UniProtKB/Swiss-Prot annotation:
Protein family per UniProt: Belongs to the FPG family.
The protein's name: Formamidopyrimidine-DNA glycosylase
Cofactors named for this entry: Zn(2+)
GO BP field: base-excision repair
Superkingdom of origin: Bacteria
Gene3D superfamilies given in the database record: 1.10.8.50, MutM-like, N-terminal (3.20.190.10)
Zn-finger (FPG-type) residues: 236-270
Lineage per the UniProt record: Bacteria, Pseudomonadati, Pseudomonadota, Gammaproteobacteria, Pseudomonadales
Keyword presence, RNA-binding: no
GO molecular function, one term: class I DNA-(apurinic or apyrimidinic site) endonuclease activity
């Protein structure tokens, strides 16, 4: 599943080609995504100029002069730029054609993504309850410490809760907890302020570096320019269960936490 760095990589790849451009038409080949694509999307968006391409958590917000297209990549989706009129392949569900001659093409083999229309996106039901962005000053270790008090939930699903902080998905939670030396099974409420301060620093560092590296390509992700991400080449623990720890050589353990696979080092993480 594309996580925050992959979505931000997509945003950075497509924004320069969309912002300031006028939409000539929208072609919807299959509206059956997680939620149906609005039947009148072509009418609503065609003729409008795209003002800005923003991101909130893992949602891309394509802001037009009136209204915003809210897009989520789901489990296997991607948005990339192609020449308008390029014949579509299987699973290429939507083209947003621009007057420049390019088209923003949405591909989603598993159809778990979304393309929704809103006149007030930040108060949309999918966005209004989201926590702070991890790479802003609104998120820090103090927030993690305060929100964790009295929580018996394991720390890994706690930091993956979008009400606590957005965009810390399975890959980056696994890596950040390793970097901070915290066992992902520990109760969130039993972790000290000092360790949460360290964890917040590592979350910010790892997310920022993953964005710089173009995200993590495991199976389906490609950026808006059609290129894969390269952060997967530098993963310390995610997806490496049963292999030696890159720091101490101890065999990494793989467990299930909150219905997600989690890998950790029993020596480095306490």
């Amino acid at each position: 599943m594309p996580e925050l760095p992959e979505v931000e990589t997509t945003r950075r790849g497509i924004a320069p080609h969309l912002e300031g451009q006028r939409v000539s038409r929208v072609i919807v080949r299959d509206s059956r995504l997680r939620w149906p694509i609005p039947e009148d999307l072509d009418i609503r968006l065609s003729g409008q100029r795209i003002v800005q391409v923003d991101r909130r958590a893992k949602y891309l917000l394509i802001q037009a002069e009136v209204g915003t297209l809210i897009s989520h990549l789901g489990m296997s989706g991607n948005l990339r730029l192609v020449e308008a009129g390029l014949p579509a392949l299987k699973h290429e569900h939507v083209d947003i054609e621009l007057e420049s001659g390019l088209a923003l093409r949405y591909t989603d083999p598993r159809r778990f993504g979304a393309m929704l229309w809103s006149l007030d996106p930040h108060n949309h039901e999918l966005l209004i309850r989201l926590g702070p962005e991890p790479l802003t000053d609104l998120f820090d270790g103090e927030r993690l410490y305060e929100r964790s008090r009295g929580k018996s939930i394991a720390v890994k699903p706690f930091v993956m809760d979008n009400a606590v902080v957005v965009g810390v998905g399975n890959i980056y939670a696994t890596e950040a907890l390793f970097a901070a030396g915290i066992d992902p099974r520990r109760e969130a409420g039993g972790i000290s302020r000092a360790r949460y301060l360290k964890l917040a620093i590592e979350i910010k560092r790892i997310l920022a570096y993953a964005i710089e590296r173009g995200g993590t390509t495991l199976r389906d992700f490609i950026g808006g320019d059609g290129k894969p991400g390269y952060f997967q080449q530098e993963l310390f623990v995610y997806g490496r269960g049963g292999q030696p720890c890159k720091v101490c050589g101890t065999t990494l353990r793989e467990i299930k936490l909150g219905q997600r696979a989690s890998v950790y080092c029993p020596k480095c993480q306490r």
